Regions:
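Alpha-helical structural context detector biased toward long hydrophobic helices
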Residues: 2-368
Length: 368
């Protein structure tokens, strides 16, 4: 039987017998988030309201170029959504935040409001995020000792979160010219079998005038956008490869535990807040080590340290298989130096803004 990269269908998953993970179901979703709503809700300043009404604070980068005294709200000042000015925080609704219209559209269904997009394939990785975060908060801190006694086996909850975070780096349109993300995309594109180029054919038929805003806002050329989006479809499709190329890529990153170090930093309610940026990650690199920082919630972030030699080598072999995930993590509570460094890196590597639970810059940049 001819191999299919995807199946376009209006039926439910249970009604479609073969290749359920290659199935794309038509849906009316037009607002496509490149940082998932479930991730953003971990920073909601009004978590007591229904999910569709939850907000986060958007802090433009200009806020952090002002003296501390100028950043502090004056008595009586109010922070409201829709009233953002230069250097001022704004409360923004998560439903429309860090999203773009038709960003991940493969094709439209004629004479209907529906389209085929990455919604269901992303949902596989986004589901269970809140529960995974809650589980990480229950883990016991690793008291620094010697050898392996200061680490614990990576729980499934952390693997789930890290998988979504690495996908977030790749699906974020701000990152298509970022060297780290670009090289990952190139590695995947080089391993796409011929069947995966069916995505290129379909996406390239889209009317350029309908994606003009995407090209302008994220500095894509038309062909650059087509290649980037087709790469996302190709790496996630289990019709192209099973396990998917993305799953193989992710698992291979951690295939040699001795070459990877994972750290989880957590903070109690009175120990300060963590930011997340519109770039989805922050990075530090040296000739010997690459450190990738990802926000998890308002009170947690993780850092994955990769030996540079290993990082350069695995991109040539990841497509062979998806090795079993194994590794250890060090859990550290209340480290203010690391929190401030993470927040500063997040700010310095953001594109337009950072986001969090508080409108005050000092809550992210001062030790508690």
């Amino acid at each position: 039987m001819t191999r299919q990269a995807f199946i376009l269908s209006d039926c439910e998953f249970s009604e479609c017998g073969e290749k359920p993970y290659a199935l794309l179901t038509a849906n009316p979703t037009k607002e496509h988030h490149y940082i998932a709503q479930t991730e953003q809700r971990q920073h909601a300043h009004n978590p007591q309201v229904s999910p569709q009404n939850q907000n986060v604070y958007k802090l433009p980068l200009s806020m952090f170029r002002e003296p501390a005294a100028a950043r502090r709200p004056r008595s009586g000042d109010k922070v409201r959504g829709g009233s953002e000015s230069r250097g001022a925080a704004a409360s923004v609704n998560i439903i429309g935040n860090l999203a773009a219209k038709n960003l991940y559209t493969l094709t439209f269904v004629e004479n209907t409001a529906n389209q085929y997009n990455l919604e269901s394939w992303f949902n596989r990785h986004e589901s269970g995020y809140e529960e995974a975060c809650n589980h990480l908060r229950t883990l016991q801190e690793c008291r620094l000792k010697t050898g392996e006694t200061d680490t614990v086996k990576v729980p499934d909850a952390l693997w789930r979160i890290l998988r979504l975070k690495f996908l977030g780096i790749l699906r974020n349109p701000h990152n298509h010219k970022n060297l780290f993300a670009h090289r990952l995309h190139e590695a995947v594109r080089a391993r796409l079998p011929e069947v995966g180029f069916e995505f290129v054919r379909l996406i390239s038929k889209r009317d350029p005038s309908r994606i003009e805003a995407i090209m302008q806002n994220y500095r894509f050329s038309f062909l650059g956008y087509v290649d980037w989006l087709a790469g996302l479809y190709g790496m996630l499709s289990e019709g192209v490869a099973q396990p998917s190329l993305f799953e193989r890529l992710f698992c291979t990153i951690f295939a040699e535990p001795d070459a990877v170090k994972i750290e989880l930093f957590r903070y109690a309610e009175n120990e300060g807040l963590c930011l997340f940026g519109d770039s989805s990650f922050c990075l530090q690199a040296s000739p010997k080590l690459i450190s990738v920082g990802v926000n998890i919630s308002h009170d947690m972030f993780a850092v994955v340290h990769l030996q540079t030699d290993r990082w350069l080598a695995f991109k040539n072999t990841f497509h062979h298989d998806a090795p079993k995930l194994e590794g250890r993590v060090r859990i550290i509570d209340g480290d203010q130096t690391q929190r401030l460094m993470f927040n500063q890196l997040t700010i310095s590597q953001a594109h337009e803004a950072v986001f969090g639970r508080s409108p005050n810059a000092e809550d992210y940049l001062e030790a508690v």
